[in-house]
């Protein structure tokens, strides 16, 4: 795509003494510059291993047209090409030696390449710093002993007498005309291009200059689009995708980006739009408006104007952030408007908005493709490192495990949030290398040192969960961060937007995943909607999402069995044991005055804490209370918490011994537990039930349903009772028995505290952090394949 003369002039302006244009299978670029003595004839071609067709790219220098033609005639057999290049004494280099172009490249192929070739591209502007540095370190680590070993194994004659001493070069790997001369090869000062090549043959070249990045790779694609646009090839239809592509490609034109160019690009898009339509659609108007708004909201030092034309790294980073804002904001607005239409029953209005999300997301394709392309070598690098371990001295990776934990909920009143905060506190004390990644409004962001919040583009209300919001995270920003951090493991607590991004990144970067099945979403959906079809659809999503994980953790054996019944692989299912703060939740926090402001004195107090919502089955406990005269005379029921079902219960005008203290936290929550006498938790959908464990630690016997995970927290008949979830009479009788027998209540209270004492957070964290479930899961996969 790049004009040879323009490429030559740019390289000279950037300080290059000699220049080689490595066109694919052609010397046409060189032919147009042959009059310049500092230009080296060169080309790049793709060779193949004849045994399996695995492709390998090779750059050849100093050749003529006849030699090129002969080489191309042999390229189906890499071995024959190698022999021809040696016979013709042509300087040649393996390009991007660890890039698995079609997924076939393996450590076996790399060992063959090491024997066959003496020169390798160790720094490429088309590869990331991580890849380049490993390539260089690997080549530097080669030894005679290693070559003896692989030569005996492969029976290949090395290219030279000292094959462990490899020549290394750097190259721009540019195909859009922007990165020329930013990566190069240095050699001792010489007078002619021929002498320079001779220095490289003698392995005296040193790669230098910038490394590539996924952002630069994506923008290269857009820059090619800019050149197509300038050539009138870019399609001209007036739709959302075309408009945004037009804006991006205009911003990525080869000229120096200025404030006027940014404004001009947006204006060109508007003019193009009005030429194509008499009246632009609402979506197109929104796209342009959001683009302009996003740019105006950028701080001045983050805008595109005023950047030196050679400072492409700064420009690329700023444009990436801008594209992230634009795409995220427009997507959020469309999704939010669609949700509002659906809530109003206007399905016909909402569906086109949802459909419009697809072309907008496709504009991200160059970014997503680049994330994939530039990270495909991670698996090969891991395999190669494992193969030479103990043979070659490569830079040691830190033995300290680095983990990213993802959750869509971190500050809400639920077990997931509470668990994450407790785990983060233990991680701080133990100095574990853990980051908990979330996306919530900055006003609600957690402040702990282990939390990393990416402010969302917006938030969407969840039906029947007015107190909770579904965040729309900045996808590109999160993925770029994850790429840069090289985490050893991902842990995913929720299958929401943040969890989906984490799973996507895990597949891109080859990171193992542990996913925790915290919430029984299918049953929640059925209870909220009454629609069994939606419940089945939710199960399909759960199987798909958790099926992508390497290991899945269930909070209880009950839910492990349920997941198996719904098609989950039993060998990939593990139990996730949580803990509690035994000092914080403690009987000593009992305060006889705590419930007095609510009119409760001298009664046996039944306590519920948590979210007050329909799926918690609280009406069973309320009805049981209302149907028993002894309970109304001697007991009280305190429903502590907030939620959409609270107002419905209050509206029933319940008797005064049923009270609603509202939402409490911190020390007040500890007192709310300890100041009660019995804990009730009738939910049939909770996968675990943190509040049950907290109540047990506070010295309260617990009444729980026979469905869900909480029944596994108590010792039935000792620290509490397990009751049929929807049997009001069974709950009434159990509650009455505890009111009428102080001895039974006190005995169960002591057993509850003793039961909880075995489950502190430090133990729970260490067990989970140190567990390695992957060998077991991999073993099962191998067993299935063999069988």
Model-flagged regions — what are they?
Residues 701-704:
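Short hydrophobic beta-strand element within catalytic cores of glycosyltransferases
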Residues 1-2, 65-185, 211:
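Domain-core and long-helix interface of multi-subunit machines
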Residues 405, 599-626:
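Conserved donor-binding/catalytic core segment of Leloir-type glycosyltransferases
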Residues 647-667:
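Nucleotide-activated donor-binding/catalytic signature segment of Leloir-type glycosyltransferases, i.e.
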Residues 684:
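Aromatic "clamp/platform" in nucleotide-sugar-dependent glycosyltransferases that forms part
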Residues 716-717, 721-728, 737-742:
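Conserved acidic donor-binding segment of nucleotide-sugar-dependent glycosyltransferases
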Residues 664, 671-676:
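Short alpha-helical donor nucleotide-sugar binding micro-motif in glycosyltransferases
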Residues 1-89, 130, 137:
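A metal-dependent hydrolase metal-coordination microenvironment
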């Amino acid at each position: 795509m790049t004009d040879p003369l323009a490429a030559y002039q740019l390289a000279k302006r950037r300080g290059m003494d000699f220049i080689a244009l490595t066109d694919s299978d052609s010397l046409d670029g060189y032919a147009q510059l042959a009059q310049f003595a500092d230009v080296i004839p060169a080309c790049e071609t793709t060779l193949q291993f004849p045994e399996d067709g695995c492709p390998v790219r090779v750059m050849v220098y100093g050749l003529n047209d006849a030699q090129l033609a002969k080489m191309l005639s042999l390229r189906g057999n890499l071995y024959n090409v190698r022999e021809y290049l040696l016979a013709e004494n042509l300087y040649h280099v393996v390009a991007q030696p660890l890039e698995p172009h079609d997924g076939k490249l393996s450590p076996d192929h790399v060992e063959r390449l090491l024997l066959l070739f003496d020169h390798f591209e160790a720094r490429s502007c088309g590869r990331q710093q991580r890849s380049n540095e490993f390539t260089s370190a690997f080549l530097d680590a080669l030894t005679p002993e290693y070559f003896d070993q692989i030569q005996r194994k492969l029976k290949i004659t090395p290219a030279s007498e000292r094959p462990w001493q490899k020549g290394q070069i750097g190259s721009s790997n540019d195909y859009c005309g922007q990165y020329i001369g930013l990566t190069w090869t240095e050699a001792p000062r010489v007078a002619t291009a021929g002498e320079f090549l001779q220095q490289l043959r003698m392995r005296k070249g040193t790669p230098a200059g910038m490394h590539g990045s996924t952002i630069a790779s994506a923008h290269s694609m857009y820059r090619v689009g800019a050149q197509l646009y300038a050539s009138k090839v870019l399609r001209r239809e007036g739709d959302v995708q075309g408009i945004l592509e037009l804006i991006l490609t205009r911003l990525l034109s080869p000229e120096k980006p200025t404030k006027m160019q940014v404004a001009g690009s947006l204006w060109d898009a508007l003019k193009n739009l009005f030429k194509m339509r008499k009246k632009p659609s609402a979506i197109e108007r929104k796209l342009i408006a959001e683009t302009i708004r996003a740019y105006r909201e950028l701080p001045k030092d983050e805008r595109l104007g005023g950047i030196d034309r050679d400072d492409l790294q700064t420009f690329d980073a700023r444009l990436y952030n801008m594209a992230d804002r634009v795409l995220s904001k427009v997507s959020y607005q469309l999704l939010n408007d669609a949700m509002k239409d659906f809530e109003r029953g206007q399905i016909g209005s909402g569906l086109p908005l949802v459909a419009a999300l697809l072309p907008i997301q496709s504009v991200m394709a160059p970014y997503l493709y680049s994330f994939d392309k530039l990270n495909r070598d991670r698996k090969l690098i891991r395999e190669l490192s494992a193969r030479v371990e103990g043979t070659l001295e490569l830079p040691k990776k830190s033995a300290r495990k680095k983990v990213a934990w993802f959750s869509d909920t971190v500050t809400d009143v639920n077990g997931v949030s509470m668990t994450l905060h407790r785990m983060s506190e233990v991680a701080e004390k133990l100095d574990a290398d853990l980051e908990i990644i979330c996306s919530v409004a900055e006003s609600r962001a957690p402040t702990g040192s282990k939390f990393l919040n990416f402010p969302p583009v917006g938030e969407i209300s969840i039906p029947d969960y007015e107190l909770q919001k579904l965040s729309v995270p900045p996808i590109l920003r999160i993925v770029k961060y994850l790429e840069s951090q090289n985490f050893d493991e991902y842990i995913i607590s929720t299958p929401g937007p943040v969890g989906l991004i984490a799973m996507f990144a895990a597949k891109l970067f080859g990171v193992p995943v542990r996913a925790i099945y915290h919430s029984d979403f299918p049953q929640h959906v059925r209870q909220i909607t009454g629609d069994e079809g939606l419940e089945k659809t939710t199960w399909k999503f759960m199987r798909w999402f958790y099926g992508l994980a390497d290991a899945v953790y269930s909070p209880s054996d009950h839910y492990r069995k349920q997941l198996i019944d719904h098609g989950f692989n039993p060998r990939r299912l593990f139990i996730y044991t949580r803990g509690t703060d035994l000092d914080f939740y403690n009987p000593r926090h009992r305060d006889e005055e705590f419930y007095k402001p609510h009119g409760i004195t001298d009664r046996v107090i039944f306590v519920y804490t948590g979210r007050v919502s329909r799926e918690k089955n609280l009406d069973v406990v309320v009805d049981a209370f209302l149907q028993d005269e002894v309970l109304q005379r001697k007991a009280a029921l305190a429903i502590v918490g907030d939620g959409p079902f609270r107002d419905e219960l209050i509206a029933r005008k319940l008797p005064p011994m049923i009270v609603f203290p509202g939402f409490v936290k911190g020390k007040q929550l500890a007192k709310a537990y300890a100041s009660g006498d019995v804990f009730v938790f009738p939910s049939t959908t909770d996968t675990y039930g943190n509040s049950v464990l907290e109540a047990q630690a506070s010295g309260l016997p617990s009444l729980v349903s026979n469905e869900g995970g909480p029944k596994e927290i108590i010792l039935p008949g000792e620290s509490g009772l397990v009751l049929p979830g929807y049997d009001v009479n069974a709950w009434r009788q159990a509650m009455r028995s505890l009111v009428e027998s102080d001895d039974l209540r006190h005995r169960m209270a002591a057993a509850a505290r003793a039961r909880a004492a075995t489950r502190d957070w430090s133990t729970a964290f260490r067990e989970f952090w140190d567990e390695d479930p992957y060998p077991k899961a991999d073993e099962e996969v191998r067993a299935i394949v063999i069988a």
